Amino acid sequence: DRKEIMVIKKAVYVWVIGILGMISFAACSSASQGEVPSTSNAALDNIFARKSVRAYLDKEVEKEKIDWMLRAGMAAPSGKDIRPWEFVLVTDRVALDSMAAALPYAKMLTQARYAIVVCGDVAQSSYWYLDCSAAAQNILLAAEAQGLGAVWTAAYPYEDRITVVRQYTELPGNIVPLCVIPFGYPATAQEPKQKFDEKKIHYDKF
C-alpha cells in the first residue's frame, strides 16, 4: 500500500545519501593521502594540475600560446594598479645556453627553446616583486592550461644571478629580473603533487 511505498522510498533515500557520503569521504581521504583532487571547476583543476616541468621536447610552441601566457601574466593583481612588470621573451640559443651554464638552478634552459624573464621596474614600485610574483604564477598556470610545461627559476634576490640575467637580456638599471621561466612541451608525462596540508591552516589565531 501507500504507507509501505513511502517507507521503501525513505529507506532508498537514506541509502543513497549514505553512499554519497561514503564516496565524498573516500575522495577527501584519498586527496589528503596524496592524490590530487579533481573538481568540476576548470580553473581549480588547472591550479591543482600545475607542476614544475624541467625537460622539454625540441618542438616549436605556437605564438598564440606564448601570447596567452604573457597576457595571463599581465592579468595579475597589482598594488594601486601600477603594474610594474616587464617581460623578456628569450629565444636566442646562445643566451639560453649561457644562462643555463651560469645560473645554478636553471640547467634545463639547455633543453628549452624559450624562456620568459619576469622583471620589475623599481622606479615604479618598491613592491614590484610582489606584483611580479603574481604575474609569474599566472604565466605558469597559463602554460599548464595549454598543455605546456614550465618552471620558476629564481633570479631575485641573488645578486650574482641578477647580474647573469642582466648580462644576457641587456636590462636597463631600473629593471630587475625576478625569475626566469623556461617552458615548452613536456618531454615526459609528469604527475602533479598533492600539497594540501590541513595543519597549515589556522582559524582566527595561530
Regions found by a protein language model. Give the residues of each.
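Acidic, surface-exposed loops and disordered segments
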Residues: V7-A11, W15, I23-F206
